[in-house]
Amino acid sequence: MTNNVALVAGARGIVGSQLVKTLLHRGWEVIGLSRNASSHPQNIPLVTVDLLDAKHTARALQPLSKVTHIFYSAWINAENWTEMVEPNVTMLRNLVCHTAMISSLKTVSLIQGYKVYGAHLGPFKTPARESDPGVAGAEFNAAQLAWLSDYQRGRAWHWNAIRPGVVGSALSGNTMNLALSIALYASLCKSLNLPLRFPGSEQTWRSIVDYTEAGLLAEATVWAATSSAAENQAFNVNNGDVWRWSELWPLIARWFGLECAPPVRLSFQQMFKDYQPAWRELARRHRLVETDILQVNDGQFADFVFSWDYDMFGDGSKLRRAGFWRMQATDDMFFTLFKQFRAARIIP
């Protein structure tokens, strides 16, 4: 056991859920935060809190004086990028300010992404590096870090910012799970005797993307939270390799025993809606755990990823130079996730 006590905001998400597992495995005490009262799959204590409400946050956090580390992977959506800034900065500010006042806080780990490099706006400089200049315009990840780094100045605790690529996870029911969307699509294609057609444009087919396995991301995040080399630093965290879809997609098709077909723009959201009856029959026939495909994954994030008709990757060497060495072959990551989906009877 360690004396470290983690407070995880976003503990049920694609990043937070794996982070909880990793922390528990390392002997940490872990407390989760949630807007709604419910249980957590890992049976950790959950504190129900509305981080947008400063007074409610102060009351809810009052008993948590033993917290040593905050891991922040929560976020709230809005109509556009501009409207996402204020609520997301407010949530982080309320959590950090109140926790810092009542505890012996050591580190705040902020999960970000490549949006800080302008990845959401269109083609951007690749490989993206942590030293790249900021991008003009409203973006909540950058605004959060600007507030956090300013607030931390002169205080005894430290921050770090973690920037993964597309995260690979076995978590079901999360819209951000690209591997799961692909697995559902491939399962439908197999049942309908269709090839696995690439669902993006020719430009997307040729673009370079990097990925981050959820376990590697969790380990890197814990390393950064406990390493002096990571104090007040941002790190890109990726598997350590890069792929073009034109290389990776045929391997995925082969894993499912399917022919690979040329690119045609397809919407996963629309496809999953159209094939709800087909999935119900497939789930019944193979005794899958969920008969409603939209409850497994809605395809929204997959549509976002396959709309990228430009390169999307970062330089992960700063993390390795600082002392975190683990790497992961991305093709093996996908194959392992597909096996896990199958073992859990999410796909046939």
Regions inferred by a protein language model and the residue ranges of each:
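Conserved glycine-rich Rossmann-like NAD(P)H-binding loop of the short-chain dehydrogenase/reductase
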Residues: 28-39
